[in-house]
């Protein structure tokens, strides 16, 4: 038995299972039989036939086998097999499939047999059917631990239970790309996608039916094989056997079977093969295929015209042409007693619901060739061959018969139950769509009669839906050829086509056409049009009634036209119009909405009694006494307009529909739109607000601007790394890479230095050689002459020897003297280009005449060269004689290297190395091609001329003034020029504090008092003219310039006779003038220096103690009669902070500061009889500035932050703290104790940098340390009291770190 995985078969949808997934159009999987575990072997199953024991893989295969092929099965009791029959949708059938009711079912009578094909995997029992086995397995609750919370079904695996729950929850994540269908499983979606495939490559060679798979075609061909072997006279295979060998119409090749002929045509003559999109037409005599109906008719007339085989199926009369046969068939439809049309009988009857027994009888088909004027009431897919009729409705034509069911598509099988028919339709005719049932109250579309009954009970509160439905008037139609009664024209049309059509396949595939007025049936469209034109458009005609009733009691069908189509098709029912709009205009609202809104042209329903009565009266008036109507006229039933052509009549009806159909307007702004889609887009704009957010890709946070997102990315998702360029290792902090460099790349290198001559050597061997040659050989003679290299034992000997090297060697060209001959020779070679092989006797005149002649010639040549070159050396600076220079004897150019000189001579004078310069001097001066326009000197290269021209132009000016754009050759000249642009030339006052500056020293000192003017990028700024300077030299130039311009200012006054007057100094408070600077006290207030007289200082002490004197400042005498009005007017004292000048403690108010001074610093309180201030023992810590770097060292207590100026005072102060408080200093943050405040402060620093990777950063200058105590030492040495950041709100103390403030608050102010 095969155990490979196979998808379970598709099945009809159970109406009671409301959480099923819809598969395909009208197909669903049963909630009980639906496969949940496609991946498990225990959930897969195979199907076997009970009669012949043949095994099948799907339910559709075994169903088709039992119906058509199995010789041991009757073919009508298939529904007895639960694995093949269709489950009923009634409540009783639901109980049978529920696992909770499985105990009451007798499914285990056959268990225990050793040969049964379905054994239980949990026990020894076996069963004959798979359904029995599934019911039995549900009893093993201990083996199936997972239970569905909806239907209590048990599962072995959790994934099976979860997949099953999706059936109840409706979780459908697999969507069809072609339509809006959704499925919970991918295999169901694959099955559904096959319905959208228009290409069916597998064609039946007999009936030309298409299939999606070869297996389906193989099963279909078995049906033809069974029919071929049987004794059916109407079989097409028998017809083919009776015929001669078939021949191809193209190549005259003969074939025994039609499938061989069709295969030959498809392969050899593809242009002659019928199109797959259209149904092929086959001749009833020779079975030749045709594409068009006209070709088939011409073929029958020409080839088979002599044979009278066009027989009538009613009277067996034969005709030569098909048209004659059609005319004869029309005569059969005329009644014998009258000349009226033999239309199908209309009987107003009620129908009884059969939902209790066959609720799924709604299997209907939508014919694509339906006549537009036919009523669109849902058609029944299964039709009855005989139905029980009452004698009042049908008269003698009614008869009692057993209810049987037959397929309307293949018309070959009879089924005893509707369930078997449903299985047949689902397995054999999957390509046929499904139709629904419509409620007569609210016109709601329902999938089945059972759902219709439930809808009537719940919505319309019907106690007995069967009685209500039967009481409702309905129109039924009776076939004139048999006793069949149907409920709509479409069903009657299918009945006539299938039961009373010709044997000709072309005639069978065509539709029967019914008149919408009298319901007369016609076999051709042309005959129907002729009938409407001749009968219903002629007032003289009297054929209007039914042949059964004999009186015009039938209501006139109202006409509805689609206004969205170009040809304006006409429909006689709103339902048909709605269906047309749904299929062809999906975005257009249905016409049913217009009827409910009261916008229909006629308010009465066509089936209502009032409408029937009114239309009947109108028709009677028209038939009886109305005016005569001309033939071929069309009269509008809305306005009475008459038209002679059908096109103009349809166009006129379209105008009525345009006025009836409402306009699509926006409920917000009343704007009109042509269709529903544009209206929906417009209305969405009213309810839509577009907001732009910028989302972080890492943490999904939203930001309203790009700047916020970039700031977030820089703060949270950006890391700065440090890469070592030596080993390419990466570090996350600066401290880490510093440690890495100190550990791995700090290589030790030893240098060996000689202590005697301070020479350095790389290794010890070189030092030993040096000592051997320089110190051992001349041992005892450590003093060496720098001129001749001779060594001496004592320094006195060396000094006596140096006197012998007096400058006795004089140069005969420039009169320079040298100590040694070698220096003179070097000077001659470098400066005068004299190369002598023999040292001349410079002290005597004993030189030979030849030597003197050569020297004279060379001297003359050099003199002439200097004169002709326009004093080239004069334009350049003198070269230092200590550096070796190589001069050109032609142009006088000097170079520091001999190779540069050789390159110059080769480039500019065409003199190669080694050639005699004296021989070519005169000739070389004339050969140059590049001539100087200034001095007429020639050069051999353009670069040489360019360098020479620079000597005439002067130095290159690379420095440009940023104010006026003038260029200068040096930075010094540019600085002196920039000062001339100053706007403060006549004042020497600081533009920030307005303090007068009298000298350059005061100017430079005052610039240091404004630290906010410093900038590490641009340098300093002058306090007088506010220009930016880049160096201290430039700042000094500014000071010199400004002090020279202000030399006749306010501080230095001159009389008319030019006599110098003594410099005066003013008090910054009372503006009194003093002749001596010592009479004023210099104060540093807010970083600015001020001068106050003694009286102002004394009075400001009593009113505002915050103004203090710096230590070491001179205290002049205090005047008793000095006024404070000027100081009060200026408001100088009011701007001082309330901070104690002695201990630098800040207070909130002046009263607290006064109390502090009276109690703590009594020695600073001035005595009324005293005229001088006392020098305080404790003074505030001054600001550290460049001008105050030489002040006294201060000491500050960590505990109370008092400042002392000597170590003894702070030691005594700390000892008092230890006596009062002891050695236990507790950290309030972690309850640790320390023996000193310094250790406690170091511990609090560690608290501040917890989680920072072991690094400690200074909060003031941001210097990084790896130890907390190093940071503590740095703070004490580099930063003072004024740099502390955190102030205590309850006392004047300040702290560097927040943890210090927290610990201080918890210790001192916790109460």
From Swiss-Prot:
Tissue: Widely expressed. Expressed in all B-cell stages.
Ranges of Polar residues composition bias in the record: 359-370, 387-398
Location relative to the cell: Nucleus
Ranges annotated as C2H2-type zinc finger: 47-67, 118-140, 146-168, 174-196, 202-224, 246-269, 281-304, 310-332, 405-429, 437-460, 477-500, 513-536, 560-585, 634-656, 664-686, 694-717, 722-745, 752-775, 783-805, 809-832, 886-908, 930-952, 959-981, 1020-1042, 1065-1083, 1138-1161, 1195-1217, 1225-1247, 1256-1279, 1286-1309
GO cellular component: nucleoplasm; nucleus
SMART domains: ZnF_C2H2
Cross-link annotation Glycyl lysine isopeptide (Lys-Gly) (interchain with G-Cter in SUMO2), location: 1146
Keywords, in A-Z order: Activator, Developmental protein, Differentiation, DNA-binding, Isopeptide bond, Metal-binding, Nucleus, Phosphoprotein, Proto-oncogene, Repeat, Repressor, Transcription, Transcription regulation, Ubl conjugation, Zinc, Zinc-finger
Biased composition (Low complexity): 83-102, 1105-1119
Region annotation Disordered: where it falls in the sequence: 81-108, 357-398, 863-883, 1105-1136
Sites bearing Phosphoserine, chain numbering: 546, 605, 608
Highest taxon in the source lineage: Eukaryota
Pfam families (alphabetical): zf-C2H2, zf-C2H2_6, zf-met
GO BP field: neuron fate commitment
A single MF term (Gene Ontology): zinc ion binding
Its job: Transcription factor that can both act as an activator or a repressor depending on the context. Involved in BMP signaling and in the regulation of the immature compartment of the hematopoietic system. Associates with SMADs in response to BMP2 leading to activate transcription of BMP target genes. Acts as a transcriptional repressor via its interaction with EBF1, a transcription factor involved specification of B-cell lineage; this interaction preventing EBF1 to bind DNA and activate target genes.
Family: Belongs to the krueppel C2H2-type zinc-finger protein family.
Domain notes: Uses different DNA- and protein-binding zinc fingers to regulate the distinct BMP-Smad and hematopoietic system.
Disease: Defects in Znf521 are a cause of B-cell lymphomas. The Znf521 gene is a frequent target of retroviral integration in murine B-cell lymphomas. Involved in most B-cell tumors in the AKXD-27 strain. Viral insertion into the Znf521 gene in the AKXD-27 strain causes Znf521 overexpression in B-cell tumors, resulting in the up-regulation of EBF1 and the increased expression of a number of EBF1 target genes. This in contrast to the role of Znf521 in other cells as a transcriptional repressor of EBF1. Misexpression initiates tumorigenesis by perturbing B-cell development via an interaction with EBF1.
Oligomeric and partner information: Interacts with EBF1. Interacts with SMAD1 and SMAD4.
Name assigned to this protein: Zinc finger protein 521
Species in which this protein is naturally found: Mus musculus (Mouse)
């Amino acid at each position: 038995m095969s155990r490979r995985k196979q998808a379970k078969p598709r099945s009809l949808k159970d109406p009671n299972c409301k959480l099923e997934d819809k598969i395909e159009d009208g197909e669903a999987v049963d909630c009980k039989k639906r496969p949940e575990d496609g991946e498990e072997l225990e959930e897969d199953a195979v199907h076997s036939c009970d009669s012949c024991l043949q095994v099948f893989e799907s339910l559709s295969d075994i169903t088709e086998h039992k119906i058509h092929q199995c010789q041991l099965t009757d073919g009508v009791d298939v529904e007895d097999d639960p694995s093949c029959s269709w489950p009923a949708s009634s409540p009783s059938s639901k109980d049978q499939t529920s696992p909770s009711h499985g105990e009451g079912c007798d499914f285990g009578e056959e268990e225990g047999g050793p040969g049964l094909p379905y054994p239980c995997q949990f026990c020894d029992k076996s069963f004959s059917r798979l359904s029995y086995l599934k019911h039995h397995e549900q009893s093993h609750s201990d083996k199936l631990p997972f239970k569905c919370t909806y239907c209590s079904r048990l599962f072995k695996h959790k994934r099976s239970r979860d997949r099953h729950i999706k059936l109840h929850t409706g979780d459908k994540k697999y969507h069809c790309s072609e339509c809006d269908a959704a499925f919970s499983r991918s295999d169901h979606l694959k099955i559904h996608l096959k319905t959208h495939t228009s290409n069916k490559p597998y064609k039946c060679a007999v009936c030309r039916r298409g299939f999606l798979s070869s297996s389906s075609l193989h099963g279909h061909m078995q049906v033809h094989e069974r029919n071929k072997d049987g004794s059916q006279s109407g079989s097409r295979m028998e017809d083919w056997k009776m015929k001669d060998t078939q021949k191809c119409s193209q190549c005259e090749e003969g074939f025994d079977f039609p499938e061989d002929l069709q295969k030959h045509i498809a392969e050899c003559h593809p242009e002659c093969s019928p199109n797959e999109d259209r149904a092929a037409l086959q001749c009833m005599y020779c079975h030749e295929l045709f594409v068009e109906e006209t070709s088939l008719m011409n073929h029958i007339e020409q080839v088979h015209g002599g044979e009278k085989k066009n027989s009538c199926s009613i009277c067996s009369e034969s005709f030569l042409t098909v048209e004659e046969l059609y005319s004869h068939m029309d005569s059969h439809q005329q009644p014998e007693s009258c000349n009226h049309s033999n239309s199908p009988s209309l009987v107003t009857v009620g129908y009884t619901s059969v939902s209790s027994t066959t609720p799924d009888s709604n299997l209907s088909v939508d014919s694509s060739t339906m006549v537009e004027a036919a009523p669109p009431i849902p058609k029944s897919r299964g039709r009855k061959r005989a139905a029980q009729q009452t004698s009042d409705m049908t008269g003698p034509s009614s008869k009692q018969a057993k209810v049987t069911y037959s397929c309307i598509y293949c018309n070959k099988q009879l089924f005893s139950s509707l369930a078997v028919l449903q299985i047949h339709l689902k397995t054999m005719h999957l390509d046929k769509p499904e139709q629904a049932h419509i409620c007569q109250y609210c016109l709601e579309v329902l999938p089945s009669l059972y759902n219709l009954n439930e809808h009537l009970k719940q919505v319309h509160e019907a106690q007995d839906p069967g009685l209500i439905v039967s009481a409702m008037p309905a129109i039924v139609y009776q076939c004139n050829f048999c006793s069949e009664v149907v409920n709509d024209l479409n069903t009657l049309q299918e009945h006539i086509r299938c039961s009373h059509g010709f044997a000709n396949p072309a005639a069978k595939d065509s539709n029967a056409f019914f008149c919408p007025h009298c319901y007369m049936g016609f076999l051709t469209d042309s005959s129907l049009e002729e009938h409407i034109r001749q009968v219903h458009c002629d007032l003289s005609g009297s054929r209007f009634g039914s042949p059964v009733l004999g009186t015009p009691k039938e209501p006139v069908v109202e006409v509805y036209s689609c206004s969205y189509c170009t040809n304006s098709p006409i429909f006689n029912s709103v339902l048909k119009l709605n269906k047309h709009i749904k299929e062809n205009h999906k975005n257009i609202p249905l016409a049913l909405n217009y009827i409910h809104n009261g916008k229909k042209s006629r308010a009465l329903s066509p089936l209502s009694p009032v409408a029937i009565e009114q239309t009947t009266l109108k028709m009677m008036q028209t038939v009886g006494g109305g005016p005569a109507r001309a033939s071929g006229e069309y009269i509008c039933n809305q306005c009475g307009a008459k038209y002679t052509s059908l096109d103009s009549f349809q166009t006129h009806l379209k105008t009525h529909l345009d006025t009836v159909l409402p306009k699509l307007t926006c409920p917000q702004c009343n704007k009109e739109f042509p269709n529903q889609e544009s209206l929906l887009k417009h209305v969405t704009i009213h309810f839509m607000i577009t907001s732009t957010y910028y989302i972080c890709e890492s943490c999904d946070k939203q930001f309203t601007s790009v700047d916020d997102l970039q700031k977030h990315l820089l703060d949270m998702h950006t890391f700065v790394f440090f890469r070592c360029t030596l080993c390419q290792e990466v570090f996350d902090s600066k401290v880490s890479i510093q440690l890495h460099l100190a550990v791995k790349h700090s290589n030790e290198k030893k240098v060996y230095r000689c202590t005697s001559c301070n020479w350095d050597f790389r290794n010890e061997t070189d030092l030993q050689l040096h000592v051997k040659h320089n110190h051992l050989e001349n041992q005892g003679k450590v003093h060496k002459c720098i001129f001749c290299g001779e060594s001496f034992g004592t320094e006195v000997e060396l000094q006596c020897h140096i006197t012998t090297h007096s400058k006795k060697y004089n140069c005969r060209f420039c009169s320079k003297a040298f100590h040694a001959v070698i220096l003179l020779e070097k000077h001659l070679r470098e400066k005068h280009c004299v190369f002598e092989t023999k040292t001349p006797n410079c002290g005597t005149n004993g030189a030979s005449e030849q030597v003197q002649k050569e020297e004279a010639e060379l001297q003359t040549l050099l003199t002439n060269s200097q004169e002709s070159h326009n004093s080239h050396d004069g334009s350049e600076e003198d070269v230092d004689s200590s550096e070796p220079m190589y001069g050109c004897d032609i142009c006088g150019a000097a170079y520091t290297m001999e190779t540069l000189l050789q390159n110059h001579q080769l480039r500019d004078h065409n003199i190669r190395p080694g050639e005699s310069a004296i021989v070519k001097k005169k000739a070389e001066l004339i050969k140059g091609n590049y001539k100087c326009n200034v001095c007429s000197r020639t050069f051999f290269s353009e670069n040489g001329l360019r360098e020479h021209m620079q000597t005439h132009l002067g130095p290159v000016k690379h420095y440009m003034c940023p104010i006026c754009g003038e260029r200068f050759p040096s930075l010094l000249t540019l600085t002196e020029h920039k000062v001339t642009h100053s706007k403060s030339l006549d004042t020497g006052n600081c533009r920030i504090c307005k303090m007068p500056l009298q000298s350059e020293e005061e100017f430079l000192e005052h610039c240091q008092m404004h630290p906010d003017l410093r900038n590490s990028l641009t340098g300093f700024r002058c306090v007088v003219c506010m220009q930016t300077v880049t160096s201290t030299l430039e700042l000094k130039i500014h000071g010199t310039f400004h002090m020279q311009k202000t030399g006749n200012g306010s501080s230095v006054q001159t009389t008319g006779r030019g006599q110098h007057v003594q410099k005066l100094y003013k008090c910054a408070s009372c503006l009194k003038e003093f002749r001596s600077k010592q009479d004023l006290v210099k104060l540093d207030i807010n970083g600015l220096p001020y001068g106050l007289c003694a009286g102002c200082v004394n009075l400001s002490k009593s009113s505002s103690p915050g103004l203090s004197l710096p230590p070491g400042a001179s205290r002049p005498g205090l005047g008793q009669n000095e006024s404070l009005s000027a100081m009060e007017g200026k408001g100088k004292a009011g701007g001082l902070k309330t901070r104690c000048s002695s201990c630098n403690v800040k207070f909130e108010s002046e009263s607290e500061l006064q109390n502090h001074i009276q109690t703590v610093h009594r020695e600073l309180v001035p005595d009324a009889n005293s005229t001088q201030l006392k020098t305080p023992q404790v003074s505030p810590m001054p600001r550290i500035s460049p001008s105050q770097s030489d002040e006294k060292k201060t000491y500050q207590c960590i505990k109370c932050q008092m400042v002392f100026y000597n170590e003894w005072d702070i030691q005594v102060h700390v000892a008092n703290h230890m006596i009062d408080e002891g050695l236990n200093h507790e950290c309030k943050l972690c309850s640790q104790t320390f023996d000193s405040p310094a250790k406690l402060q170091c511990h609090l620093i560690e608290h501040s940098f917890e989680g920072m990777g072991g690094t400690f950063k200074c909060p003031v200058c941001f210097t990084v340390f790896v130890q907390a105590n190093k940071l503590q030492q740095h703070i004490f040495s580099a930063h003072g009291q004024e740099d502390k950041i955190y102030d205590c709100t309850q006392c004047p103390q300040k702290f560097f770190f927040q943890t210090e403030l927290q610990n201080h608050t918890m210790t001192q102010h916790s109460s």
